[in-house]
Amino acid sequence: MGVFWSRGYHGTALPDLLRATKLSRGSLYAAFGDKHALFLRALDRYIADALARMDVELGPRHAPVDGLRTFLAGYVDRTSGSSGRRGCLLVATAMELAGHDGDVEGRIGGFFKAMEAKLAGALSRAKAAGELAAGVEPASAARILVCFVEGLRVVGKTGPTRTTSQATADALLDRFIR
């Protein structure tokens, strides 16, 4: 996954994959098929890891607003410093391949829908607890948060300070809660 993350799909050559996996050409093809199949497996793992993290952050074991704050703080952490400069495999892949590769487009679209659903669930729990501001609809707020965090991943490549990113995340969430 790291090679694709660092170089992108088109920038990754077979020798890069052989070095990273420590497999021979024949073993790599036997294990994964081809470069595209290996890339899709790497992308699937990245997505699964992100969704599992969201399940922990936004799950019912946390108060909804606390979970939302934890979720946003996690994104701020991942978009700050060297992590921010590295960027997001999903965003980079969307920019590089989503318009040309149906398999990739479907996976990324599915991820964004799943993220939106998890956020809408937490926001619905907050609404039921009387913690959402008047007029805030969970589904709309969830879409806004998805756009915000993915935009934060892009802006993170330019090196904003963690303090600035966290203040922006807090200001946005504060618009949604009481």
What function would you assign to each model-found segment?
Residues 3-37, 41:
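Helix-turn-helix
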Residues 41, 55-86, 138-145:
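Hydrophobic alpha-helical connector segments
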Residues 44-50:
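Short, basic, alpha-helical segments at the C-terminal edge of helix-turn-helix-like DNA-binding modules
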Residues 45, 56, 103-114, 118-121:
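Short, solvent-exposed amphipathic helices
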Residues 65-66, 106-111, 128-144, 163-164:
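All-alpha amphipathic helical-bundle segments outside canonical DNA-binding/catalytic cores
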Residues 67-68, 82-103:
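Amphipathic alpha-helical segments used for helix-helix packing
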Residues 70-78, 113-129, 148, 158-178:
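C-terminal peripheral helix-coil segments that are non-catalytic and often amphipathic
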Residues 86, 91, 136-155, 168-175:
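Hydrophobic alpha-helical segments that form the core
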